[in-house]
Each structure stands twice: as C-alpha cells, then as structure tokens.
Curated annotation (Swiss-Prot):
Signal peptide: none annotated. The modification 4-carboxyglutamate is found at residues 7-8, 24. This is Conotoxin Cl9a. It is found in: Secreted. One of its GO terms (molecular function) is toxin activity. Disulfide bonds join 9-33, 15-40, 23-42. It comes from Californiconus californicus. GO terms for cellular component: extracellular region. Its main location: secreted. The cysteine framework is IX (C-C-C-C-C-C). Expressed by the venom duct.
Amino acid sequence: TFEPNAEECIVDGRCKHRSDWPCEMSSGTTGRCDVSLGACGCSN
C-alpha cells in the first residue's frame, strides 16, 4: 500500500526514501518512506 504526501517523509523539501525512513501508515502500522509516480509518501 502506498499513501502519497506523507509529511513525515519530507525533510528540508526532500523525500527521505533513500535512507529507509520509517513512517506511520493511516492504519497505524509502520511503513517506510518511498517515492511512487513522483510523489513522496509512506509505503508498506
């Protein structure tokens, strides 16, 4: 599942996907920041 525009994944205007940054999905589970179709978001 990919949830775009996860604010916690964006630091200083850049998506933190390359550093395997953790993030919280809307379901409450922990995911990892990712980029999909040019959007930064949280993915599990």
